[in-house]
Amino acid sequence: MKDLSDAELATLLDKDIFHKISAAADKLQMECYVVGGYVRDLFLERPSNDIDVVVVGSGIKVADELKNLLGSKAHISIFRNFGTAQVKYKGVEVEFVGARKESYNRGSRKPIVEDGTLEDDQNRRDFTINALAVCLNKDRFGELVDPFGGVDDLWDGIIRTP
């Protein structure tokens, strides 16, 4: 395990798939972040082909634009009921979701789901180490967003909720 600067994260994300996601999000003028386990695994120096992307806006639109940029070798699955999409390309799976926030009515365990910000989406994550996000937009490519101290928790071996 090692600490990673934003520049080092940008270097680790210097792959065609991330640059294409960046181009798709920038074209649609939407903020876009790789989140969760993929980011955690970068710090742990573990390889992963399972990428989760949060879009402040429509994850489905960014996934569709990515498919257009990647061409016929990419396969897209859209799950409108859940507001998600998955793009498979050269052995890599990228899951897209729009940032959302959840609230609950008294006496109900069923969440009320609304569009949200990156912070809203990070707040609903299970653990701080899975709330880590790295920006993919060109102007902030590689910038870590860690509002809950997830990197410190990772180093300290602590599992806690945001």
Functional labels for PLM-detected ranges:
Residues 1-162:
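Catalytic cores of the polymerase beta-like nucleotidyltransferase superfamily
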